[in-house]
C-alpha cells in the first residue's frame, strides 16, 4: 500500500515535524511493507498544484496534518481529491481536529477518520489494519474517530501518552531540510492550565531521554544548522532538563547555530540566569508569553505568572546583551478592555524586548476559552484561525484599532530599524501605546495602511509623521532617522531626509588613507584594500550628539557593516569625531 503523509505549512521555510515523526516511527516499529512518503506544501500554493502532486503520486492512503492556520485548506484538499481519486482512504490528525472529531467527520464525508492526540502509534495501527483486514478492527483501536461502512461515526477512547524517547530522530538526511527551520522537541505536555491554550489539556508532562537529546543536539551542531526551534511548550519547567541542554549547547557551541526556546521567565532561577549570562551573543533566544499584566485577566485565564518577577528577569537578561528576547501579548482576553490592554502594552514595552508580538485571541476547539465564550460575550470568526472579533470588554471598533497598532509595532518596533528614533518620539507622546496608536491613525488618515511600502520608505513616512506632531524638533528627528538608517543599511545613495550634512571628500580620503596605513578601527579588514574598506563601511557627520543626550554638537560616526550585532543586526559603530578633526589639522 502506498501511503502519503501530507503537510500544508504556513511558509516554505517551515517544516512539519509531525509527519516526519509518524513516518520514522512507522518505519522503525511498524510491521508493514507499506511505502510511506511525505509531501510538504504551503498555504500559498494553488490548490490545483497540490491536487496534481497528490494525484501523480497515486497514494492508496492520504494522511493530512491539521492546524489552525491550514484547516480550511486541508478540508478543501479532502473534498477535491476524493472527486478525482474516489477509492483513496483519507485520515486527518493534529490539534485542530483532535477535540471535535465527530463534528469534523460530519462536515467532511470524504474523510474516513480522525487520529486524536499523539499519532505515532495510532498511525502504525492504522497501517496494520489496512494491510491485514483480519487484524483487530477499528472498533478496538484507541485514539481515533472513524466512519463505519454504514456511515455511522464512532469515537473511541483516547490513547495513553507514549514514551517520547521512542520517537526516532527525523533529521538524519539534512538535504530534505535545506533552507528550512528545524523544529525539535524534548518534551510534550504542559504543567500550566491557561484557558486559551490546548497544551493545558495534556497534563502528562514527559521528557525525551537526555542522552538521546545530547546526541541529536550534536548532530545539529556538527551540521552547522542556522537555527533550531524547540517546540517544548515550557522548556524550563524542569530545571535539571533545561540546565543539561543549555550547558551542552554552550560547551559545544559552533559559533553559528542558534537555539530558540519558549520559557516561563518567572521560573528561571539564579543558576539558570548565571549560565545564560555566559553564553555567546546569539546562541539562544527566548520567547516569553506575558499575554497581559491585568491581574483580573491573569486570574481568569488560569495563568500562573508574577509580572514583577518576569520584568526583573527580562531586564536582567537584557543587561547581559547576549540574548534575543521575544515577549507576547494577547488582545481579546477576558476583563481586558482597550485601556487595560494599553497598560499591558506599556508595561511590556518598558522591558525593551527585541520583539514584542501583539497577537489576538484564537478560540481553539476544545479549550476552556471556548466553553466560556458566552460568559465573556466572546464573538470570534467562524473559520480558522477563530480569531476574536469582540468581547463584552472590547468592542469590535477597538479590536480594529488594535489591529492597526499591531501593524505599526511590527513595522516600526519589531523591524529594529528605528531603535534611536522611537525612544525620542515617545517623549512627545508620553507613553509608547499612544505613539503607536497615533501612528496607526496617521497611516489610515493618509491612505498609507492599504499600500505596500519599501523598507526605506518607512523612514520617510516616520519623518513626515514626526514633523506633523512635533515640528519644533524636526532637525533632531532627521538626525536620528539618519543614524537609524545607516545602522541597518549599507546604502551608497542618501535618503532624502538625510540632507547634505556629510563629510567632505578630503576628510573621507584622509580617513581611509590613515586606516589603510594603520588599522585603528577596522582590524577585521586586515587583508582588504582601501577600496574594499570603503564599500564595507560608511562615515556620517551629525550636528547632534545622536549617541548621547542629543545636544547640538558635531558627531562623526563610522559604521562597520561586516561586524553586526547578532541580536538586532545593527552595524558596529565608532565615534571618530576627534580623529577627523586631527586629520584635517595636518
Question: Which role fits each region the language model picked out?
Answer:
Residues 165-319:
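Radical SAM [4Fe-4S] cluster-binding motif and immediate context
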Residues 2-6, 47, 60, 407-586:
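Radical SAM enzyme core and accessory elements
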Amino acid at each position: 500500500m502506498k501511503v502519503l503523509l501530507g503537510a500544508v505549512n504556513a511558509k516554505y521555510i517551515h517544516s512539519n515535524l509531525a509527519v516526519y515523526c509518524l513516518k520514522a516511527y512507522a518505519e522503525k516499529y511498524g510491521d508493514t511493507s507499506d511505502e510511506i512518503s511525505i509531501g510538504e506544501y504551503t498555504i500559498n500554493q494553488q490548490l490545483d498544484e497540490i491536487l496534481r502532486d497528490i494525484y501523480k503520486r497515486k497514494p492508496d492512503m492520504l494522511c493530512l496534518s491539521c492546524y489552525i492556520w491550514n484547516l480550511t485548506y486541508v478540508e478543501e484538499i479532502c473534498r477535491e481529491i476524493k472527486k478525482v481519486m474516489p477509492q483513496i482512504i483519507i485520515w486527518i490528525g493534529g490539534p485542530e481536529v483532535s477535540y471535535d472529531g465527530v463534528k469534523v467527520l460530519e462536515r467532511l464525508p470524504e474523510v474516513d477518520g480522525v487520529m486524536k492526540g499523539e499519532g505515532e502509534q495510532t498511525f502504525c495501527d492504522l497501517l496494520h489494519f489496512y494491510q491485514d483486514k483480519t487484524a483487530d478492527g477499528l472498533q478496538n483501536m484507541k485514539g481515533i474517530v472513524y466512519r463505519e461502512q454504514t456511515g455511522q461515526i464512532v469515537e473511541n477512547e483516547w490513547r495513553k501518552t507514549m514514551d517520547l524517547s521512542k520517537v526516532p530522530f527525523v533529521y538524519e538526511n539534512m538535504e530534505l531540510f535545506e533552507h528550512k527551520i528545524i523544529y525539535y522537541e524534548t518534551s510534550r505536555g504542559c504543567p500550566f492550565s491557561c484557558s486559551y491554550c490546548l497544551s493545558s489539556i495534556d497534563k502528562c508532562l514527559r521528557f525525551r531521554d537526555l542522552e538521546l537529546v545530547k546526541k541529536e543536539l550534536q548532530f545539529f551542531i556538527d551540521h552547522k544548522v542556522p537555527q533550531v526551534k524547540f517546540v517544548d511548550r515550557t522548556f524550563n519547567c524542569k530545571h535539571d532538563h533545561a540546565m543539561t541542554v543549555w550547558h551542552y549547547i554552550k560547551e559545544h557551541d559552533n559559533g553559528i547555530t542558534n537555539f530558540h526556546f519558549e520559557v516561563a521567565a518567572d521560573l528561571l532561577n539564579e543558576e539558570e540566569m548565571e549560565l545564560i549570562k555566559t553564553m555567546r551573543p546569539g546562541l539562544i533566544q527566548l520567547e516569553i508569553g506575558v499575554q497581559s499584566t491585568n491581574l483580573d485577566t491573569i486570574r481568569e485565564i488560569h495563568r500562573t505568572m508574577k509580572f514583577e518577577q518576569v520584568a526583573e528577569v527580562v531586564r536582567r537578561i537584557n543587561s547581559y546583551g547576549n540574548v534575543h528576547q521575544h515577549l507576547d501579548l494577547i488582545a481579546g482576553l477576558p476583563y481586558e478592555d482597550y485601556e487595560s490592554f494599553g497598560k499591558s502594552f506599556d508595561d511590556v514595552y518598558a522591558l525593551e524586548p527585541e520583539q514584542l508580538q501583539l497577537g489576538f485571541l484564537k478560540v481553539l476547539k476544545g479549550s476552556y476559552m471556548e466553553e466560556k465564550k458566552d460568559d465573556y460575550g466572546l464573538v470570534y470568526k467562524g473559520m480558522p484561525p477563530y480569531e476574536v472579533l469582540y468581547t463584552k470588554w472590547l468592542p469590535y471598533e477597538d479590536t480594529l484599532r488594535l489591529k492597526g497598532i499591531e501593524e505599526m509595532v511590527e513595522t516600526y518596533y519589531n523591524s529594529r530599524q528605528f531603535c534611536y528614533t522611537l525612544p525620542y518620539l515617545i517623549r512627545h507622546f508620553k507613553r509608547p501605546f499612544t505613539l503607536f496608536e497615533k501612528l496607526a491613525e496617521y497611516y489610515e488618515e493618509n491612505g498609507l495602511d492599504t499600500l505596500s511600502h519599501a523598507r526605506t520608505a518607512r523612514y520617510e513616512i516616520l519623518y513626515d509623521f514626526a514633523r506633523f506632531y512635533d515640528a519644533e524638533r524636526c532637525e533632531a528627528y532627521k538626525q536620528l532617522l539618519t543614524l537609524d538608517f545607516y545602522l541597518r543599511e549599507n546604502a551608497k545613495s542618501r535618503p532624502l531626509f538625510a540632507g547634505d550634512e556629510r563629510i567632505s571628500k578630503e576628510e573621507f580620503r584622509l580617513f581611509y588613507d590613515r586606516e589603510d596605513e594603520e588599522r585603528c578601527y577596522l582590524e577585521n579588514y586586515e587583508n582588504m584594500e582601501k577600496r574594499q574598506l570603503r564599500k564595507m563601511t560608511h562615515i556620517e557627520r551629525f550636528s547632534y550628539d545622536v549617541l548621547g543626550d542629543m545636544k547640538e554638537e558635531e558627531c562623526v560616526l563610522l559604521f562597520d557593516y561586516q561586524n553586526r550585532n547578532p541580536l538586532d543586526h545593527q552595524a558596529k559603530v565608532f565615534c571618530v569625531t576627534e580623529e577627523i578633526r586631527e586629520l584635517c589639522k595636518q
